[in-house]
From Swiss-Prot:
Keywords: Mitochondrion, Transit peptide. SMART domains: RAP. RAP domain is required for FASTKD3 function in mRNA stability and translation. The lineage of its organism: Eukaryota, Metazoa, Chordata, Craniata, Vertebrata. Residues 592-650 form the RAP domain. This is FAST kinase domain-containing protein 3, mitochondrial. Expression detected in spleen, testis, colon, heart, smooth muscle, kidney, brain, lung, liver, brown and white adipose tissue with highest expression in testis and smooth muscle. It is found in: Mitochondrion. Belongs to the FAST kinase family.
Amino acid sequence: MAFITLRRAFCHKSILWIPGAVVALKIHPASHAPKAVTDRLSVCFCSLQPELFRVRFHHAYCKNFHSEKGNDFHPVGEPWSSQAQEWNQPGQSLQNEDEEMLFRRLSYFTSFEEVLSFISALDTLPVPLAMAALLRICEIGRRDGEQRLPEGVLENRAFQALCLRCERDPSHLTNAGLVTALQSLLTLLPADPQSSLMLSLVAECQRRLQRGNLEVHHLCVLGESLAMLQGASCETLKLVVRQLQSKSVETFAPEEITSVYRILQVCPEEVDKHQMFLNTLNNFSISVVPYLSPKSISHVLTALVALDQTHALPLLIKLGKYVVRYIPRFTNEELRKVLEAFVYFGHSDRFFTEALEQHVSALCFSLDPAVASSVMGYCSRKRILSKPIFDVVSEIVVCQWDRLSPSQIAELIEPFGKLNYVPPNAPALFRKVENVLCARLHHFPPKMLLRLLHSCALIERHPVNFMSKLFSPFFLQRLQGKESYLDRLSLAQLTQLFLTSVLECPFYKGPKLLPKYQVKSFLTPCCSLETPLDLHLYKSVVIGLIDLLGSRLYFASKVLTPYYYTIDVEVKLDEDGFVLPCTVDEDIHKRVALCIDGPQRFCLDSKHLLGKEATKQRHLRLLGYQVVQLPYHELELLTSRLELVDYLQRKLFSQSSAVHW
């Protein structure tokens, strides 16, 4: 809702329409005006004689007029051809034209020069016409993809005269023209909140706001402009929010719902004050979701994150349903915001994953690296092992590594280790990663480098050539930075890499990690390299073991080994295969480590262990433990205590006929 397009047409009436991000002045024959437009009659705009030049608003319900990305500046099928020459023929007098013809002529111009030449030729310049010309210039800049107007336009004397004329007396503008002008100028003019033009427009908006003359649509446009111009500290913005809260949410159009969320998003620290209004808004928005564009859905999800609306589950589910449909239509930035919101709210479903797989596979090498990083981050956080996505990403790293920044390389590679997936092109992938690290090692921040190499080790791609650098005092000092100590997660990753070098890389002869940098346990509350025990499954297994072994004395729980790992349940055996009491420390021939693996130790909805759990079990075997895995998907099939005991007996003792109890 940022720009005004003066549309070409031949008729008696004028309609100001708002397709998503563009306010467009479009002229239709009165007999053919769409009913959805005529039903939403609204405010006069920018007329020297308001009775001659009226405008109307319509909302985004009318899909025929909907401009999803806000860049449809002309009717479909009408080319952008300059019409300036026909207005410069001899015998025509600009001064004698009526007001409607002036606005109509302005709608034909397609360049800055045409608009400025037209304005320069006028003897008098009414405020409404000056504002329409100014907005036409802004719209041309937006159409041409300008981030701001060119310096040549800003320094043009006719343009400066336009700004001065609009600044002097904005009271002649209608509410729609005023708020739209403010929003439009913020987009392409230098963002100086103290400029006299901005101050004049804001002051006029404040006067009308205090009189209570602004409708919901005007409040939304004004609120977004004030948020952009002055931020959350703006008292006028708070007044806008209060007036919006006094309105009936049920009368809000879809684009107005989106605007309200964006306005509230600017003030997350005041969310408690607005929570009742937000609850009403969240509940009503469920019915509006089908009418939202992909851009609006992305905006709403972003606002829900900023406002921490984790309890708005029905709205999130409805938004998620439509996100699945719109994935190919999202821009890269919008899709990133959607993924961030889904991670924040913990939302995932197989339909979204399938749609994401299709989208990534279809784009393949044209997939934007930033989007690829966001997709992999989403899969990693949600523990979603999507082989189609991971395979495409591995090919992107191999073939387009020179397009990737160090942070993107790390973000794309780390999920492979976390989710314990080795792609089909693993030799080429990790050879490329090694080459990149050799060439650009100093471009990787210390913690990022450590995370990257640690994730490689989780899938047995051991960074032997870099271990000496990781364990060197110089790197450890860089890793610590200005802090007084190294964070525990970094120490745990270093310790596990050191243990890996000892157990899996006996040929490594470089520096060792000093004991003062080694953690005592990988299982810690905030930064664990092990997944905590599932207590429900643990209690079931304990009951079964007591029935099987005859006493709680014959097994120990949550045993911390000298090698930093914590074993869920440990059973000790002597040389003859007899089960020993857990308190005995002599004559132990074998230790059995029972891994009670709950759902959190696997990738989502699969039987595929996470990288850290697979590494733990691999290391325990190398340390001499007999590892017995008790996965949740097997335990949940047991329907009786007798079945549980029989299951544990088979798991514990089928591997050795010499075991007794």
